[in-house]
Amino acid sequence: MLRWAVTFLIIALIAALFGFGGIAGASAGIAQILFFVFIALFAISLVARGLSGPSS
C-alpha cells in the first residue's frame, strides 16, 4: 500500500511540474490544432466513403 502511495505522489509531482511550468498552455494550443485537423480528416473520410458507394 505504501508503494502505491509513493507512486501516486511521484505522478502528482510530475503533473504539478507540467501544470505550473507553463507546458500546459502550450499543450492546450497543440491539442486544439490537432482537434481541428482530425475533425477535417474525419469529414474527408466521410465524404470519400459516401462517394465510393455501397460496398459488397
UniProtKB/Swiss-Prot annotation:
Biological classification of the source: Bacteria, Pseudomonadati, Pseudomonadota, Alphaproteobacteria, Rhodobacterales
Pfam families cross-referenced by the UniProt entry: DUF1328
A Gene Ontology term for the protein's cellular component: plasma membrane
Main localisation: membrane
UniProt name for this protein: UPF0391 membrane protein Jann_3570
Protein's UniProt keywords contain GTP-binding: no
Topological type in the membrane: Multi-pass membrane protein
Transmembrane segments: 4-24, 29-48
Database matches in NCBIfam families: PRK13682.1-1, PRK13682.1-3, PRK13682.1-4
Compartment(s): Cell membrane
This protein's UniProt keywords: Cell membrane, Membrane, Transmembrane, Transmembrane helix
Family designation: Belongs to the UPF0391 family.
Matching InterPro entries: DUF1328
